[in-house]
Amino acid sequence: ALMMEGGVQINAQGQRFHDETQGYSEAAVHVLAQPGGVAWNVFDDALLAFAQDFPDFVAAQGAGAVQHAADAVALAQLIGCPPDALQATLNAVQPGTDPATGRTFKRALQAPFHAIKVTGALFHTQGGLDIDAQTRVLRQDGTPLPNVLAAGGAARGVSGQAVWGYLSGNGLLSAIAGGHIAAHTAQQLLKDSAP
């Protein structure tokens, strides 16, 4: 939420490297491509106050994940990046559209700054067995296996083959809709096999 509201991600060179509003799956790929596979989520007091409404953020803050810096020089020291590069990056965060990434900012970030060191991680897998429209598991030749159904995380999902296809809730969507379809398919299989 902090990135969507104006926070930025900074790498070890003191630079932004993508549009932070794309989503966490996309961000993970960009972060892992940075030196050391890490970045810093940087935000200001207004965003720190906003974050207090999120229990997971408050828990991370209580565990010491949130670091504080009085100004850009102190923030550069914390991140371990060149102060002049970081200052130029922060100066470029102004209301309007960033020409490098296409991201739109509502306002500039103001010192003091706060930062959390982040990296990308595998949250969960997406997809599974190939199925047809009735949730029947398919062989390699595309024909259905008799009486074998799959839904939810056991079946291929709707997210596609790239990070941009994932939306929060896709797993639940596949489980509910696929389970519903599988139940109807199973019911029909039972009817068809009844004497």
Residues covered by each model-derived region:
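An anion/pyrophosphate-binding glycine-rich loop and adjacent beta-alpha core
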Residues: A1-A85
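A glycine-rich dinucleotide-binding beta-alpha-beta segment and adjacent secondary-structure elements
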Residues: A85-A162, Y166
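Short, ordered coil/turn segments that flank beta-strands lining enzyme active or ligand-binding pockets
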Residues: A12-Q13, A133, Q140, A177
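Hydrophobic "anchor" residues
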Residues: R16-F17, V137, I181
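A short, polar/proline- and glycine-enriched secondary-structure boundary/capping micro-motif
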Residues: A27-V31, L149-A150, A194
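Predominant activation on well-ordered alpha-helical scaffold segments within soluble catalytic domains
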Residues: A39-F43, A72-A76, Q87, N91, ...
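A conserved FAD-binding loop/helix module that cradles the flavin
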Residues: I116, G157-S193
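Generic secondary-structure signature for well-ordered alpha-helical cores
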Residues: Q15, Q22, Q77-D84, A88-P95, ...
